[in-house]
Amino acid sequence: MGYILNDEGKDLLATVKEFCEKEVKEQCKEYDVSGEWPKEIYDKAAEMGLGALEVPEEFGGIGIDRVTAGALYEEMAKADAGFFTTMTASNLALKPVLIAGNGEQKQFACDVLLNGGYGAFCLTEPKGGSDPGDCKTTAVKDGDEYVINGRKCFI
């Protein structure tokens, strides 16, 4: 797919493409066969900030736009779907915190990704699967408190 990127975006794309070609593509195939975790690849990706692309500038991220992020993600996915998924899945955990968290929570979540960590988005409803839109639990404000109704199970 073609993207219209600014000069910074083009430079980032070239860097990610080179990294994926040299470090990810063939090596991840070998790890798929061996079943090992390619820690050194993910450590290098973390050093490059690839797991924290969506951290806003105000919390220490590079503040790239969605189009540039999409181009970088596409390049990662071309190299290896598992690598792409690992690098982007933390954003599922980050988004709700950025939307509804307080400043301290937002900074904490962003720092985890900026320091090479990972986030996880987990649903605890029976039959929850991976569709948060299908959740049945409700939270209704009752005075100063919330009344929560629903069924939960642990992952």
Label each region the model flagged.
Residues 1-11, 139:
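Intrinsic disorder at enzyme termini
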Residues 23-155:
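Glycine-rich flavin
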